[in-house]
């Protein structure tokens, strides 16, 4: 009798798992108000205003004075980047920042694309909107929303934008031409931060959906990595009929019984359908998954619990802010860069570009609000949000970059995104795909869009 009850329970669980998992359920769209105080009476101002990044001599002088008052602790002998950012190499970066980096010139570069702001749910939302310089007769550019993560910004997309808006001039096929919109997540860079608790990725997705409607787009493509991947996923869950296609270079697969099979070992993994490339990227399991996640997720626990405390230090010290952020651009680009004295930073990025991203955080004072995003999204615990339990029912493409913090096999992606139509093993690259390998990412986006358009 007990055996029969046990078997019936297991069978019931299996049926529930598959039935509940396959149900095409979307998130409720709802509404919100995140500005200070109560929502005012009347309609919100929906005007779209031109915006320019600005700076001043006072801002630059203050930065230089703070750098001049540096107080560093010498690194341990032969520690390289295993203890975090190596202060010997940090001295080189600070010297460049203080004496060679030209913030005014970088502001001009930032302003080379059109910037705008508009009020949505009480927040001033910043975005860049880049249209193709020319469109062949009879063609219409495809709207593409691209969403950044942490510790990046809208600046991550500056090198990929011309490949998408003007591909022919950059040696790429012009079969697909895009009109690119890159917003700043509220609390990041030039987008106003929420004044209230609870502003998470779903709230962001809803605001960005309203932004696209305000720009006149009823249907559009979306792309993201890091937090951008979650925001875009939530958009597809909120308004699937408006999302023509979802392209990701990172996936947060939380409800996934397949992950347990990794513990069975490499040979069993092969029998369960993982490819040889999956095996290379996931094994040895302890080093490439367990230890890797332990090494790289410490910051996340602080932010998901008490983000404001460390934020006080980072918002007051440009040196501390730079070390904190640049360390991620080292090991999240390639974990083996821990073994290098300079963290491998200049192998993939220029100091000019890295410091431009730092300056966006520094001049806007947005490091604290950007960290609060972790508490709002992760602070309630595992599987606490409805969107974590829902699948995504829009055409999906995934670019698996080999040096991402953790590899996500195709069969895992498909559990969350059953309409996966494109999965690409990328030849190189890590977490910051658009910043590090813009051409590879652009080509994969175009390949995915081509598949969607031919469906």
Curated annotation (Swiss-Prot):
Dimethylated arginine PTM sites in chain numbering: 295
Residues in compartment: Cytoplasmic: 22-455
One Pfam match: EHN
Example GO biological process: epoxide metabolic process
One Gene Ontology term, aspect cellular component: endoplasmic reticulum membrane
Cross-referenced Gene3D superfamilies: alpha/beta hydrolase
Origin species: Oryctolagus cuniculus (Rabbit)
Membrane protein topology class: Single-pass type III membrane protein
Superkingdom of source: Eukaryota
Activity control summary: Inhibited by 10-hydroxystearamide and methoxy-arachidonyl fluorophosphate.
Catalysed reaction equations from the record: cis-stilbene oxide + H2O = (1R,2R)-hydrobenzoin; 1-(4-methoxyphenyl)-N-methyl-N-[(3-methyloxetan-3-yl)methyl]methanamine + H2O = 2-{[(4-methoxybenzyl)(methyl)amino]methyl}-2-methylpropane-1,3-diol; 8,9-epoxy-(5Z,11Z,14Z)-eicosatrienoate + H2O = 8,9-dihydroxy-(5Z,11Z,14Z)-eicosatrienoate; 11,12-epoxy-(5Z,8Z,14Z)-eicosatrienoate + H2O = 11,12-dihydroxy-(5Z,8Z,14Z)-eicosatrienoate
Sequence similarity: Belongs to the peptidase S33 family.
Protein name, UniProt field: Epoxide hydrolase 1
Function: Biotransformation enzyme that catalyzes the hydrolysis of arene and aliphatic epoxides to less reactive and more water soluble dihydrodiols by the trans addition of water. May play a role in the metabolism of endogenous lipids such as epoxide-containing fatty acids. Metabolizes the abundant endocannabinoid 2-arachidonoylglycerol (2-AG) to free arachidonic acid (AA) and glycerol. Binds 20(S)-hydroxycholesterol (20(S)-OHC).
Active site: 226 (nucleophile), 374 (proton donor), 431 (proton acceptor)
Keywords: Aromatic hydrocarbons catabolism, Detoxification, Endoplasmic reticulum, Hydrolase, Lipid metabolism, Membrane, Methylation, Microsome, Transmembrane, Transmembrane helix
Subcellular location: Microsome membrane; Endoplasmic reticulum membrane
GO MF, any single term: oxysterol binding
EC assignment: 3.3.2.9
Organism phylogeny: Eukaryota, Metazoa, Chordata, Craniata, Vertebrata
Enzyme class: hydrolase
InterPro entries in UniProt: AB_hydrolase_fold, Epox_hydrolase-like, Epoxide_hydro_N, Epoxide_hydrolase
Transmembrane portions of the chain: 1-21
